[in-house]
Design a protein with these regions (language model features):
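N-terminal secretory signal peptides that target proteins for export/translocation
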Residues: 1-8
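Hydrophobic alpha-helical segments, especially transmembrane helices
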Residues: 8-10, 61-62
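Phosphate-group recognition and catalysis centered on beta-loop-alpha active-site segments
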Residues: 15, 22, 26-356
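Sec-dependent N-terminal signal peptides
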Residues: 9-19
Length: 356
């Protein structure tokens, strides 16, 4: 998650358009699950989405971003980072996944390594020879399942899995979307965690495929400030070439490749973003700091209006990232439902979560 832009087009929410969107993603009542072993209530992603208190902390990559620069913390997206996040009180944790050459899902942020070797050109064994700490998704799912199953009538062990849009560098022909989605669905179903997982992405194409492949798994569509800029503005901000492309699954959007790093859609307006969320039947929309922060600076109240517009459509709103109390307080002031945060900071700042 995690682009940065220095400015954003002013947001003017057109309520007539927003409120006219279909409420096809109506919220259903949470289904109570019972653990086969002890008959106790198992919490679900639906329980999380139905909470009345807010904002709830989401462990960002586990206890927080760390690629090794902070030896006091576990490396991000590792089993230990995820385990620590749950142990420190995070009820929900987020990780990123990448597809390897042999069809396995590695938990890692980018689809290439520091020397630009693409992960999908390596088998899992080859990747782990270079980076022994990189786990498979099923290992992280097992950690989440452990915390979910041991919790008695309380929310715990919910996992958000970010499906990363492939970079033009590693997927020049744009062919990896369905394999990534299929692998993620397979792992989640085999772990019997479909009710405890939310698929998350900046790519509505990935979420469209996820909805077709596994409609039972909840989904979240994210937006960064970069996606509300024109191609010319993106080039000015990033210094990277911007090439508009013909996307097979375009969903009526203009897609572009930004240098060798990003392949994402642009949105003409916030209304178009929300409409895309509804079209892909997501339960959640997520806003980056580089979207919500400049929006509030340029047009005070526009961030709150975005949250209210999403809520009026039955959507939950998550924000990312809160690496300080000031970040948390800013997001909280907008009325968001959950915040991707470093742990334990987010746990300390979130409200008391009621039992199920």
């Amino acid at each position: 998650m995690k682009t940065r832009a220095s400015k954003i087009k002013p947001l003017s929410l057109i309520w007539l358009v927003v409120l006219g969107l279909s409420l096809c993603c109506s919220i259903s009542a949470a289904v109570e699950e019972r653990d086969e072993d002890n008959g106790k209530r198992r919490s679900t992603a639906e329980d999380f989405l139905q909470l009345k208190v807010r904002p709830i902390a989401i462990g960002h990559h586990g206890v927080g971003p760390n690629t090794g620069e902070n030896p006091a913390l576990p490396i991000e997206n590792t089993v230990e980072s995820v385990r620590q996040a749950y142990s420190l009180g995070a009820r929900v944790v987020e990780v990123d996944v990448q597809l390897t050459q042999d069809g396995r899902l590695a938990v890692f942020h980018d689809d290439y390594l520091s020397d630009f070797t693409c992960i999908h050109t390596l088998t899992l064994d080859q990747l782990q020879q270079r980076l022994p700490f990189v786990p498979e998704l099923h290992q992280v799912l097992a950690v989440a399942r452990h915390f979910n199953r041991k919790a008695i009538d309380e929310l715990d062990g919910i996992l958000i899995v970010e499906l990363k849009a492939s970079s033009p560098h590693c997927d020049p022909t744009d062919e990896l979307e369905q394999p990534v989605v299929s692998a993620a669905v397979r792992e989640v179903r085999q772990s019997e965690m479909a009710d405890q997982v939310i698929f998350d992405s900046f790519s509505p194409a990935l979420l469209f495929l996820a909805a077709q492949t596994a409609p039972e798994i909840a989904r979240e569509l994210d937006i960064s400030g970069l996606q509300l800029l024109t191609p010319e503005q993106v080039h000015a901000v990033t210094g990277l070439p911007v090439i508009v492309i013909n996307k097979k699954i375009s969903l009526g959007l203009t897609w572009a490749e930004i240098g060798p790093v990003f392949r994402l859609p642009g949105y003409a307006s916030v209304q178009q973003f929300l409409a895309t969320g509804m079209a892909t039947s997501v339960r959640v929309v997520g806003g980056e700091m580089d979207f919500l922060g400049p929006a509030e600076q340029q047009q005070p109240g526009s961030g709150t209006a975005f949250v209210e517009a999403a809520h009026s459509l039955g959507l939950r709103v998550f924000a990312d990232p809160a690496n300080s109390e000031a970040d948390w307080n800013f997001f909280s002031s907008l009325g968001v439902d959950a915040i991707y945060s470093v742990i334990p900071l987010g746990v300390q700042l979130q409200p008391v979560i009621p039992d199920l």
